[in-house]
A protein has these predicted regions:
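A residue-level detector for the "anchor" residue at the start of short, highly conserved motifs
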Residues: 1-171
């Protein structure tokens, strides 16, 4: 199930199923959170107190923006899709990457890949929709499993070669 939340600094967000967000109190000067799983965040702007997220062995520094962040431990990667504003991603002290709106960053096995993305596809779950745009069937199965808390089995290995385009709406 999805859970909406508000933090004392004005930041709002939605946690996806199977996700956990934690932070220390008081949450004012040090705006640091830890995330396991997936969250859509609308971070309140405060230039004097940057918002920092630790997820999947990386740090995401935010000044005020909205974006989707996915870092499920079992999936072994971090994915950020920026809707508006800017974020700074780092996996180590010497590697810092700035992101702009409509960019997608994936951090996996020590490698960072950045590409152009449609934020609507990655943020649709917040409105109760799963959107697929030519996604591999293994990815479709994984997201449906998490969304509905069920096990999906592709009956034939040949299906993994195909992609899927469509939208599931949760009424």
């Amino acid at each position: 199930s999805r859970v909406s939340f508000s933090l004392s600094d004005g930041t709002t967000g939605v946690l996806n199923s199977g996700s956990r967000l934690s932070y220390s109190l008081p949450f004012s000067n040090e705006r640091n959170i830890d995330l396991e799983g997936e969250a859509w965040l609308n971070v309140a702007k405060d230039e004097e107190h940057p918002f920092e997220i630790r997820a999947g062995g990386s740090r995401i520094r935010v000044l005020g923006t909205s974006f989707n962040l996915s870092a499920y431990p079992a999936e072994n990667y971090v994915e950020i899709v920026l809707q508006e504003g800017s974020v700074e991603f780092s996996s180590s002290e010497d590697q810092k990457i700035m992101m702009e709106p409509s960019e997608r960053l994936v951090f996996q096995d020590g490698e960072v890949k950045k590409s152009i993305a449609d934020p609507e596809k990655y943020n649709a779950w917040v409105q109760g929709r799963l959107v697929f745009r030519e996604d591999p069937m293994a990815e479709v199965a994984r997201r449906i499993e998490r969304w509905y808390n069920i096990k999906v089995v592709l009956a034939d290995k040949e299906l993994e070669k195909y992609s899927f385009r469509g939208t599931f709406v949760d009424d």
